[in-house]
């Protein structure tokens, strides 16, 4: 038997084969093209590629399972896609339309890749289909300065109100259901300036509290009972100065943005600190006041900096790319929050420096509240609320793609409901 440095050659070959077949964070796939425009009845071929890495050229994956709008192979309504990646749009598909193409890639560190098909010449459009509000400053109004919105395990809305020092629960239709925790204060289960609430797979509610002597992360049961505190004030690893956004990965680990420490911290569900990534600085992977975050089905992490851009990282915090730089010719754009859907799309809430009257104007003359991008950072469309003026907003996306967008104007505070037309 042949040997190399005392090791049987057959064992070296077996080890090399195993390494080649084991996906690492370097064996990432991408989709080409990542966005395409077709006419009704038109077609577009997509392909998945395993990216080149050190001493390894780009290569085709062993197999790709294609779907259209989550339907394997697609159908006559949304279009079909073959094993060769050729998408065919129906001749009678309504326009404008946005179609999601997904490839499940064998042997890739990121299991899924998503591409976007824009059908027709116009930009995809969202329509306000409902909503509700309270009159700001009245005795009946509970909300004073609503800040963050999410959906709990029962499909109800959780709204963090920084000025009221409370986290409210409403039905999607606006019926008040109660509060999370014990109201304003700095004791356990109380809030000073709550920013956001997010639920884990069991329905437990995790919250960020921003200012005061005790910025921290708190955990409550699904029915709102206090459970524990972690991530208290400080600059050391595992500590928080100004918590803002939260999200869970597929393993149940909690990711939390820290605006002032300029990083993302990762915790076990019980609160044990695991690791962190990011820092203040001018480099590509550095942050500039990180506010919100969203994890897709690959556990890739999207982090929006308030001053831009938004950055995408792999699950270990390795930088991938940036998008949404916020530098239009007519002035700066500020990105307050980010959320996402199950098709890997990212939704950024935006405004200009002028606040109420500073909404970003779209090319259709409407004020933009949300900018939608696909998983690869390609711009998809602008989304406008019917509220003409509002401060910084936050949005959440339901499993069916419905957007619930939180707002506060000079006289109203509430939620608008939007669906893609």
Regions inferred by a protein language model and the residue ranges of each:
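Bacterial N-terminal signal peptides that target proteins for export
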Residues: 1-8
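Short S/T/G/P-enriched beta-strand
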Residues: 21-55, 108-127, 131
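Low-complexity "stalk/linker" and mucin-like segments enriched in Ser/Thr/Pro/Ala/Gly
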Residues: 68-88
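Hydrophobic h-region of N-terminal signal peptides that target proteins for export
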Residues: 10-20
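A short beta-strand micro-motif common to beta-rich folds, especially ectodomain repeats
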Residues: 95-107
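Short, well-ordered beta-strand segments
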Residues: 55-74, 114
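Extracellular/luminal low-complexity segments enriched in Ser/Thr/Pro
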Residues: 82-96, 186
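Eukaryotic scaffold repeat domains enriched in small/polar residues
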Residues: 120-421
């Amino acid at each position: 038997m042949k040997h190399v440095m005392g090791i049987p050659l057959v064992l070296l070959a077996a080890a090399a084969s195993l390494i080649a077949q084991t996906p690492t964070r370097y064996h990432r796939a991408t989709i080409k093209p990542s966005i395409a425009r077709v006419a009704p009845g038109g077609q577009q071929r997509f392909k998945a590629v395993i990216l080149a890495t050190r001493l390894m050229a780009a290569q085709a994956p062993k197999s790709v399972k294609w779907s259209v709008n989550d339907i394997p192979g697609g159908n006559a309504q949304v279009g079909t896609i073959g094993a060769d990646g050729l998408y065919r749009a129906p001749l009678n598909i309504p326009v404008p339309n946005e179609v999601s193409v997904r490839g499940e890639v064998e042997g890739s560190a990121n299991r899924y890749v998503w591409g976007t098909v824009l059908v027709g010449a116009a930009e995809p459009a969202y329509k306000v289909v409902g909503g509700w509000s309270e009159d700001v400053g009245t005795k009946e109004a509970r909300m004073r300065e609503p800040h963050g919105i999410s959906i709990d395990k029962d499909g109800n809305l959780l709204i963090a109100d920084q000025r009221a020092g409370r986290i409210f629960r409403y039905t999607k239709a606006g019926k008040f259901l109660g509060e999370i925790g014990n109201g304003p204060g700095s004791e356990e289960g109380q809030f000073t300036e709550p920013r956001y609430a997010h639920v884990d797979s069991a329905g437990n509610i995790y919250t960020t509290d921003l200012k005061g002597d005790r910025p921290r992360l708190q955990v409550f049961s699904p029915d709102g009972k206090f459970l524990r505190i972690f991530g208290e004030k400080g600059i050391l690893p595992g500590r928080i100065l100004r918590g803002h956004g939260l999200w869970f990965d597929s393993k149940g680990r909690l990711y939390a943005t820290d605006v002032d420490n300029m990083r993302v911290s990762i915790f076990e569900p019980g609160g044990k600190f695991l690791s962190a990534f990011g820092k203040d600085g001018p480099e590509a992977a550095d942050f500039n006041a990180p506010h919100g975050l969203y994890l897709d089905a690959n556990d890739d992490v999207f982090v929006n900096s308030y001053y831009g851009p938004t950055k995408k990282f792999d699950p270990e915090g390795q930088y991938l790319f940036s998008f949404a730089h916020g530098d239009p010719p007519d002035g700066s754009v500020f990105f307050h929050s980010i959320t996402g859907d199950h098709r890997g799309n990212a939704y950024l809430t935006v405004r200009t420096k002028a606040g109420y009257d500073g909404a970003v104007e779209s090319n259709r003359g409407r004020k933009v509240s949300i900018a939608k991008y696909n998983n690869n950072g390609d711009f998809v469309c602008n989304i406008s609320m019917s509220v003409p003026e509002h401060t910084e907003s936050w949005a959440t996306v339901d499993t069916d793609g419905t957007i619930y967008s939180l707002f506060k104007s000079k006289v109203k505070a509430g939620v608008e409901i939007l669906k893609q037309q």
